[in-house]
Amino acid sequence: MWFYEKQLQYPVKIKNPNPKLAGIIISQLGGPDGEIGASMRYLHQRYSCPYDKVTGILTDVGSEELGHMEMIAAIIHQLTKNLTLEEIDGTPFAAYFVDHTTSAYPVAASGVPFDMKYVGVKGDILTDLNEDLAAEQKARTTYDNILRLSDDPDVNDVIKFLRAREIVHYQRFAERVQSG
């Protein structure tokens, strides 16, 4: 069903390592409003969806969220690549480093591992679409918060792209709710 292209949807080219920022952005990988949860939510909701057009949107957006997950992992990798222990020590990333070194393990910024309980799938299309609208808004808010905390233009460029895509996803789901 999927075709994998060996390039990201949007380029990730981080020049400066920053373990503190990596520890914040990790939340969009495995946090309650992150990309893994979004992709799992939409790709599982499609199985109980009675409308082909909505199933197509859930599949499209869920697939795109997998790509966003890859982009977040690339940001984390580039922010932590070749860090010294001195650069890590004393940052919030140090606790993460103990368990995962610099891998992209799905956790929230608080350190809580990803949990499928974040994924809302009820089997009622209106309930699920309203869950999706809320999920996209929460993801956008999280990206807004990251932008408030980040002073890295390379990171901010990618985060702004991802934030914009959350708005597009919200609009696509809203169109389906409004069309009945």
Descriptions of predicted regions:
Residues M1-G180:
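Non-heme di-metal
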